[in-house]
Amino acid sequence: MAVSQGDGTLCFVLLLCCWQETELRPRTVIPGSPTEIPFSSKQEDMSELLDEILVQEILDLNKTTPSEMPSTASTLSTPLHAGIDENYQAGGSENYHELLENLQFSPGIEVKISNDEANANANLHGDPSENYRGPQVSPGSEKSVSSKEKNSKNTQYENLSILDQILQNIGRSSGNIFHKEQQRTSAQRRSQGSQ
């Protein structure tokens, strides 16, 4: 599903790129008719319309969750990566569902969102563990939990915001993928070296 969404976006971007280079052919209009519009204003309207569509697509991409975004590894198929198991994200979705089951929503906890767009972009496009700064909870809003309510799964999430928890899970799952990929490539190199 994510691959088809990525293909649709790719086709849309290619269409926009090609559309700017094409020239619109004017329709034959009877001179003096009330529907006659100068050719230059048609081009301006079309470019404004295309700009609005592009902005909407970009905003829609920003609204999607990281699990919905297509990865470059899944959209590009090369002979080098032909042996990769395409179901490698199954563990990541299990972590995500486990996270959702363990979340406890409390009105006393506030989530601070950083306005630093560079960190946000780095977290989205790079390794989240490199730029992760830890939970951002406002002072005095920590929830006190009695010892009866604490268990091994809930204690690790009690002071984290939802965004922080998701970023941690993404870091874990991408780290597992990276580790598996390193093992696979080193095994391939050893087998090629022995031949």
UniProtKB/Swiss-Prot annotation:
Spans through the membrane: none
Glycosylation sites recorded in the entry for this protein: 62, 159
Name of the featured protein: Sperm acrosome-associated protein 7
Predominant subcellular localization, coarse grouping: secreted
Key word tRNA-binding present: no
GO biological process: single fertilization
Subcellular location: Secreted; Cytoplasmic vesicle, Secretory vesicle, Acrosome; Cytoplasmic vesicle, Secretory vesicle, Acrosome lumen
Compositionally biased residues, Polar residues: 64-78
Function recorded in the entry: Involved in fertilization. Seems not to play a direct role in sperm-egg binding or gamete fusion.
Signal peptide: 1-24
A Gene Ontology cellular-component term: acrosomal vesicle
Sequence segments annotated as region (Disordered): 64-89, 119-158
InterPro entries referenced in this protein's UniProt entry, alphabetically: SPACA7
Tissue expression pattern: Expressed in spermatozoa (at protein level).
Lineage of the organism: Eukaryota, Metazoa, Chordata, Craniata, Vertebrata
Keywords: Cytoplasmic vesicle, Fertilization, Glycoprotein, Secreted, Signal
